[in-house]
Amino acid sequence: MKMMDANEIISFIQNSKKSTPVKVYIKGSLEGIDFGPSAKTFITGNTGVVFGEWQEIQAALEANKEKIDDYVIENDRRNSAIPLLDLKGVKARIEPGAIIRDQVEIGDNAVIMMGAVINIGAVVGEGTMIDMNAVLGGRATVGKNCHVGAGAVLAGVIEPPSAKPVIVEDDVVIGANAVILEGVTVGKGAVVAAGAIVVEDVPPYTVVAGVPARVIKQIDEKTRAKTEIKQELRQL
């Protein structure tokens, strides 16, 4: 898995064409109206839907207001620099309501649950589950066969660009509402208890808990049984 450099992300955002896309439901004498070069129109008779950039469509609405009886505008962003990831080719299970930005890498058979938010430059390894309402900040990297619990936060690092991102190695389980701060590495096979706030590196095959998180024991058979990763949930 690759990790996107912070300066690459900054350059990507800086140089991207900022976008304010809208969807307009419109009614009126619409024949011959030019809604702008970026617009896609789906018009039948005197009603239709127009997709495009607000600046262009706004100008068309104003210029043709005498022909237009009514319209409703849907808009969910303003001068957005980063589009959402095109999910159609991703070999993973991604549930409705997940928000995944472009330039995110998602491994095969990963699972992204409802309400999860994954920012630019993040990496999700093969077979890893990101549970409901979890947040992966910019450049956060999660290895293979992990579970990031509901409401957990892996802090993002884009600025300052020299800062080290969160790295979660393979086979890690992170409990609900845990927080992993910038620069922390969670070692292979470790378990982070629910609600823990992790401010320093976690050794492999240990269990950490508390605020701030501290090692409370080594992984044992009882812990493995309680934190087992079920491959059946990752089948496509």
From Swiss-Prot:
Known EC number: 2.3.1.89
Substrates-to-products reaction catalysed: (S)-2,3,4,5-tetrahydrodipicolinate + acetyl-CoA + H2O = L-2-acetamido-6-oxoheptanedioate + CoA
PROSITE patterns: HEXAPEP_TRANSFERASES
GO biological process, one term: diaminopimelate biosynthetic process
Annotated metabolic or biological route of this protein: Amino-acid biosynthesis; L-lysine biosynthesis via DAP pathway; LL-2,6-diaminopimelate from (S)-tetrahydrodipicolinate (acetylase route): step 1/3
SUPFAM superfamilies assigned: Trimeric LpxA-like enzymes
A molecular function GO annotation: tetrahydrodipicolinate N-acetyltransferase activity
Enzyme class: transferase
Highest taxon above the source species: Bacteria
Claim: Amino-acid biosynthesis is one of the keywords in the record: yes
Pfam hit, one: DapH_N
PANTHER family for the chain: 2,3,4,5-TETRAHYDROPYRIDINE-2,6-DICARBOXYLATE N-ACETYLTRANSFERASE, ACETYLTRANSFERASE
Function as written in the Swiss-Prot or TrEMBL entry: Catalyzes the transfer of an acetyl group from acetyl-CoA to tetrahydrodipicolinate.
Similarity section: Belongs to the transferase hexapeptide repeat family. DapH subfamily.
Protein name in the entry: 2,3,4,5-tetrahydropyridine-2,6-dicarboxylate N-acetyltransferase
Organism: Geobacillus sp. (strain WCH70)
Gene: dapH
